[in-house]
Curated annotation (Swiss-Prot):
NCBIfam families, per database record: L6_bact (TIGR03654)
Organism of provenance: Stenotrophomonas maltophilia (strain K279a)
Protein name: Large ribosomal subunit protein uL6
Entry-linked Pfam families: Ribosomal_L6
InterPro entries documented for this protein: Ribosomal_uL6-like, Ribosomal_uL6-like_a/b-dom_sf, Ribosomal_uL6_a/b-dom, Ribosomal_uL6_bac-type, Ribosomal_uL6_CS
Length: 174
């Protein structure tokens, strides 16, 4: 079995419910579920979950399922967040109820409606915080917001992740 799949998952305060075709993780931040592939066994005892398989073809998939399960457990207990920064003159973000209104240099404000399970907030006018229990959805929402105005390489203007480094280019010499 793969090294990732062998590592046990510490559940903590999360309740893991394993059926024949699905796995459900329930915690303080919500509930997430996963369709369990056939041939992979998930055992839960004493607050620790372990995965195993008899089929040699499913070894790689077992490691993938273990990583997804681990992210589900972390998501329903602590949650995930992604921070975005707006760089540029006049670039601003503001909340209008549950919707995010972005001024990104277009002739109109861009309004983004957050999907269910995602919380958007703006600590400052140039910062956006995306929070939620599902790691994949949090990353997807952050990528959609970033796609409205990707950072350009000459001045670095646009929407970027807080930990992203923009590689700069030099302007053409006349």
């Amino acid at each position: 079995m793969s090294r990732v799949a062998k590592k046990p998952i510490d559940l903590g305060k999360v309740e893991l419910n394993v059926q024949s075709d699905s796995v459900t993780a329930k915690g303080p931040k919500g509930t997430l579920s996963l369709a369990k592939p056939a041939g992979i066994a998930i055992n839960v005892d004493n607050g620790v979950a372990t995965l195993s398989t008899e089929n040699a073809d499913l070894v790689a998939l077992t490691g993938t399922v273990r990583a997804i399960l681990s992210n589900m457990v972390k998501g329903v207990s602590e949650g995930f967040e992604r921070k975005l920064e707006l760089v540029g003159v006049g670039y601003r973000a503001a909340m209008q109820g549950k919707d995010l209104s972005l001024s990104l240099g277009f002739s109109h404000p861009v309004v983004f409606v957050a999907p269910e399970g995602i919380t958007l907030s703006t600590p400052t006018q140039t910062e956006i915080l995306v929070q939620g229990a599902d790691k994949q959805v949090v990353g997807e929402v952050a990528a959609k917001i970033r796609a409205f105005r990707k950072p350009e390489p000459y001045k670095g203007k646009g929407v970027k992740y807080s930990d992203e480094v923009i590689i700069r280019k030099e302007a053409k010499k006349a």
